[in-house]
Every structure is written in C-alpha cells, then in structure tokens.
Design a protein with these regions (language model features):
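Compositionally biased terminal segments of proteins
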Residues: 1-161
Length: 161
C-alpha cells in the first residue's frame, strides 16, 4: 500500500497544483470508508475539457507512461484513459466526468479529506455506493455487491435521502 499511497499522493498533488478538479473513487475510496479490497489500480474522476489534454500529458509524462492520443480520445468521448508509474508499475485510471445532471451533482458533493497528510478530493460514501450498484448491475459483479455490503456495514450514518 505504501507505493500505491505514494503514487496517489503524487497524482493528487499534481492535479491540485494544475487546478484540475478531480475526485478519488473506486477501491481507494472504499478503503477510506470501509474494509479494503486488494487492488493495484487507482480510480480518479476528472473534469477535463479538450484544451486540457496537452496539459494533462505534460503533468505526468516525466514519471508515468501516458498516451496523448488516449487522453484526447477519452476527453472527446467522456471516457477513460490511464497512466502507469514507471518505477512502481502502478496504474491510475482517469475517468472523464460525464455531463449528466447526476454525475455533475456527484462531483459537486465530493469531499476534501486528509489522507496521510495530504488533502485530497474523495467521492462521498453515498455516491460511491450508488456507483458500485450501477457497476454491479452492468457487469453482473459479485465483487461490487460485496463492496456495497461492506460500505453499508462500515458507514453507520449513510444519508438515504
């Protein structure tokens, strides 16, 4: 987890320094709220526009494998691209935020939290739960359903409204 934490901190600090809005999601967010699940990937939702592509590539090119075409395509299609840290061989998946009303609200609700001395933006527990239910339905994933159960057990004050 130390290498993963080092890469997470590096990515979060670079995004913040570049004023690129983001939120951590997926298994890393689950780890913040509930029982951790083994994963080597870091999932980060980012708010990007076409003109941000070159800046994103330049932010990470020194320490990460990054494909400029994949970044441009992901932004254009509101899809996903990844970067891989050269030394730690850890993958960071960047999910370009969708422009649906729910995804915009989800992003607006993100929370600033401190993780090992660094302030980072994190999806709320409620939005993580909803996303995992969607992923479970789309992929017929028992792992996602187990994550939902773990989250519901661990977070006593979920807002059901």
């Amino acid at each position: 987890m130390n290498e993963q934490l080092d890469v997470l901190k590096l990515v979060a600090e670079r995004l913040q320094h570049a004023a690129i809005a983001y939120m951590i999601s997926g298994a890393i967010a689950l780890h913040y709220y509930a029982q951790p699940r083994q994963t080597r990937a870091i999932d980060i939702v980012v708010a990007l526009r076409r003109e941000d592509a070159e800046r994103v590539v330049n932010l990470f090119a020194e320490d990460f494998y990054i494909d400029a075409d994949a970044v441009r395509n992901a932004i254009a299609q509101l899809g996903m691209f990844n970067i891989i840290h050269y030394d730690h061989v850890l993958k960071v998946d960047f999910i370009v935020r969708k422009e649906t009303p729910y995804r915009q609200e989800e992003f607006a609700r993100r929370m600033a939290v401190e993780i090992h001395g660094v302030t980072m933006w994190l999806v709320t527990a409620e939005d993580l739960l909803l996303s995992k239910l969607v992923w479970a339905a789309e992929r017929h994933s028992e792992m996602q359903l187990q994550d939902v159960r773990n989250l519901m057990r661990a977070v006593a004050d979920l807002d059901w409204a």
